[in-house]
Regions:
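Conserved ABC ATPase signature
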Residues: 132-136, 140
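Conserved catalytic motifs of ABC-family nucleotide-binding domains
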Residues: 153
Length: 246
């Protein structure tokens, strides 16, 4: 499957924030959407998520036009979303956080338990499975949120600032999890201010500037582009690609 946005435009009070951008994410691919503050990347990301309605342009899941779908309908079609803000239920344990989503599926009670156990094991949450959401570290919270998102077997996951509020020691853990999602043939779209951490794991990246796409390509191509360095990365930026083991 392919998730694609075509010619998205967004204006606020006659000010053009997004000027006809197009973005494409395939299953089994990690795609970055980056840019300096004010470039329009967050607005573009939110249009793809379904939080903001474009003035023109369309969003497709394969050949299905989902531009007017509310977020819950996009979720039903296999598009998961993880917000930057904490979304775990603070007073529920990790177990109950995951079960709360599984209970909305068509799985039987027994199948829900099996799925929960599988996700807890996969994301290394066994030792804290009974801990409440408000007692988790940033990295533990992110792992729980991603595990809960996978409870509905999404085809795509849209990650808003996945490295925000995460200790440096946990960044590689999150990167490894995102790589695992790719191996499950899930398409990933990431927007984040942490450029190095994002470019280290993306297959391709769209770099926005002043409402448009300045450059799109593999991270190595972006880093070598003089305009990209001048307006965003800086002349001393060095790409550190990661080969993550899991």
């Amino acid at each position: 499957m392919i998730l694609r946005a075509e010619h998205l435009v967004k204006t606020y009070k006659k000010r053009s924030v997004v000027k006809g951008i197009s973005v494409e994410v395939n299953q089994g691919e990690i795609v970055g959407l980056l840019g300096p503050n004010g470039a329009g990347k967050t607005t573009s990301f939110y249009m793809i998520v379904g939080l903001v309605k474009p003035n023109s342009g369309n969003i497709y899941l394969d050949d299905m036009n989902i531009t007017d779908f509310p977020m819950y309908k996009r979720a039903q079609q296999g598009i998961g979303y993880l917000a930057q803000e904490a979304s775990v239920f603070r007073k529920l344990s990790i177990e109950d956080n995951i079960l709360s989503v599984l209970q909305l599926t068509k799985l039987s009670k027994a199948e829900q338990i099996i799925k929960m156990e599988s996700l807890i094991d996969e994301f290394g949450l066994e030792h804290i499975r009974t801990n409440r959401g408000d007692l988790l570290s940033g990295g533990e919270r992110r792992r729980t949120e991603i595990a809960r998102c996978l409870a509905t077997d999404p085809k795509f996951i849209l990650l808003d600032e996945p490295f925000a509020g995460v200790d440096p020691v946990a960044v590689e853990d999150i990167q490894r999890i995102v790589a695992q999602l790719k191996n499950k043939n899930i398409g990933i779209l990431i927007t984040d201010h942490n450029v190095q951490e994002t470019l280290a794991i993306t297959d391709k990246t769209y770099l926005m500037f002043e409402g448009g796409i300045l450059k799109a390509g593999i991270p190595e191509e972006l880093v070598e582009d003089e305009m990209v360095r001048r307006v965003y990365l800086g002349q001393n930026f060095e790409l550190r690609k990661k080969k993550l083991e899991f």
